[in-house]
């Protein structure tokens, strides 16, 4: 019995870590981006902290629910939960990148094009 519990916890243990890694990687990327631009813009900090507070409790809830539910489940159900957690992590990753990164990159791109457009027109 103890061996089976250990195996189940072993399977479920790394999954929240994957979720935490994906979200923390994105948060660190945005944080470095903010520092590089000297944090002049207010909304950038707001977006960064808003996503941090949105994702943080989500990760904690998944971790706690796994700790409680895992000993009660069969192995097949555990694999289904594992797949669901990976899918959720990927969806959060896609949402994070699509919602926030265009906000950062878009600012820079617009400024860049606005500065170079007259030069390009003169070259033609």
Swiss-Prot record:
What highest taxon heads this organism's lineage? Eukaryota
More details: Partially overlaps ASK1.
Q: Any idea what this protein is called? A: Putative uncharacterized protein YKL053W
């Amino acid at each position: 019995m103890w061996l089976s519990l250990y195996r189940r916890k072993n399977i479920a243990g790394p999954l929240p870590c994957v979720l935490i890694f994906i979200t923390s990687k994105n948060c660190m990327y945005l944080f470095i981006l903010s520092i590089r631009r000297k944090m002049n813009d207010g909304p950038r900090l707001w977006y960064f902290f808003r996503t941090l507070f949105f994702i943080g409790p989500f990760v904690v809830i998944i971790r706690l629910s796994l700790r409680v539910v895992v000993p009660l489940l069969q192995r097949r159900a555990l694999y289904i939960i594992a797949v669901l957690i990976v899918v959720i992590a990927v969806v959060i990753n896609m949402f994070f990148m699509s919602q926030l990164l265009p906000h950062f990159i878009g600012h820079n791109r617009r400024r860049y094009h606005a500065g170079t457009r007259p030069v390009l027109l003169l070259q033609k």
